[in-house]
């Protein structure tokens, strides 16, 4: 099946040429390209393509070993006479053992039921990472702190970032308060550690190699701190200008590093496309061999610049010259065409080939890429029918592959954003189309709670209580139990409706409290208080000239007065009162009345799990 690997983008050149914006000459060229491709395919059945088949199949079947030794096969010896001998050995042990653990693929660990080094299954992983940073600070002035040790530490921090992100993304529901706090703590630790190492590198306190710099930049990129990548890159350029022989200046031009920074530099308008292309060619010619990272970076840059033909040409070169161990780069680039190519016909072609499994490499179609494609379609021409077509296709595809509910939730959330944007001013036709979509989704996959919750949350743009009632009835119709999240959305939705009563607010609030209590909650969560705030305070602020606004503020104060004893702690109570008043001035104007409001009309729920942590 790999005989098409070297010809992949030849196929896609036809897609570019036959797009709506293509010229007649390009159409003719595309047809000729397809004829040539067909002829070559028939004439080379037993030629080089079959040899490539055999070689790649051999690699992927395990007959040819492509395993790489840790740290590139190098090992930094420790001099037993060194005064830092014990600490260096401890650091090497932390790096070697923990780096090997964290490099284990998540999918294999889950299928083998092996504990992954994450916050739940193996807290010693994070202890080792923390220990490694402590040892680094003790040792960074010693001569044995080699570029390989610093690189391994940065690599370990990068793996820690990915481990944390993979765990959060694999959850079927949002993380609880403790998990969320741990997640933030770990990300902050990694960010602070990388900043410290970056400063040491720029101040020439420690060395690093190209692989380490690549991991450093990639870590910042994955955390969303691309501005820091640009800052560090500029500082390295200044160092290189002042000292052309500096090691950091040389390794910054390594293809693996340039491949990471090229799309960032272009996106931040540090370089234009011609300058990016020049840097790519200089780097390619100097090293005189294929570096997949460099090609992926230039392809991403080309897509950002809307240089789609250039991107396809580079993709063809990448496919032609890559070895079996590089198929991951090809798969990554395939996804980039889906998510970043502004020529929708090209992006959709890449999506279709992945869905139909027509490629000689495996493509895991990330839902974020599909969401980006839908966004690009809406941005280009607001073609909702095309968006709906892709949504239906992917619901079917993900359903056939039995992917987790979070994938569908992300896809549906994106899709219904465009649906309600299209029908925002036409709720009669919109409701008719919504009913059809619910039926279609049920036929394709089956109705699930997140699907209905997304519609509940977004249909509030119509400000129509009957629509909310209709969606709520679907829970019973399709035998979908309403969770605590659903109850929050239903309370929050009252903030989109005029002329509601206090009884409606209180009824929805009690439903939340009792459900939380039945689940064993010890306190009323922030999300519960936020739903109450949106139903009352937020509506009051948006309609402050309406007499009813003061009524809703009164209801909020009454309910808080009765139920604030179930706050987790004093900081949570501050958040729902003074903290909330900072964003909503209408609440600040009435906050002093908290202890004066009449609470006799607010019933107190009988609870078993909720604890009175605070006194009123």
Curated annotation (Swiss-Prot):
One of its GO terms (cellular component) is mitochondrial inner membrane. Residues 1-37 form a transit peptide. It is a peripheral membrane protein. It is found in: Mitochondrion inner membrane. GO terms for molecular function: mRNA 3'-UTR binding. Keywords: Membrane, Mitochondrion, Mitochondrion inner membrane, Phosphoprotein, Sporulation, Transit peptide. GO terms for biological process: 3'-UTR-mediated mRNA stabilization; aerobic respiration; mitochondrial mRNA processing; regulation of mitochondrial transcription; sporulation resulting in formation of a cellular spore; translational initiation. Phosphorylated. Phosphorylation promotes binding to RNA. Residues 34-53, 60-79 are annotated as: Disordered. The keyword Glycoprotein does not apply. Belongs to the RMD9 family. Monomer. Binds the 3'-UTR of mitochondrial mRNAs. Involved in the processing or stability of mitochondrial mRNAs. This is RNA-binding protein RMD9, mitochondrial. It comes from Candida glabrata (strain ATCC 2001 / BCRC 20586 / JCM 3761 / NBRC 0622 / NRRL Y-65 / CBS 138). The gene is RMD9.
